[in-house]
């Protein structure tokens, strides 16, 4: 977030949270849906006390599926105009570095080719700056133990339902 004075310093801190049944809709965006009894949502509110910028994080768990969905609402609660330059969707720390990264890539009429490779030390990035989802790089990644197959094993998967530009960055350190 870049403020009216040109600064890019934001100090958003936790204010409150609530848990409720169901899943809120995301007007104008593709999304998953759930009724009361099918899911529960954790809503976390954080605010920058100086600028009034507000972030509301929504995490929904589904009763019948091993899925957590996440969305964020950003609001300018201050009086000065701001420009949102970038908003990352999540940061996930996995329990091991001994994982393969699975990514889907392609081209027109040859979409969703699977690429699987071991995570390496350093940073790996899969991204698209086309402003829309396309066949070159699918906004999906999975992290699987090397012994995992299509039928068994542990996998952590993430997918943007609505992406535009996206970056999936991984970093392996010691």
Model-derived features: positions:
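Polysaccharide-binding surfaces and accessory modules of carbohydrate-active proteins
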Residues: 1-174
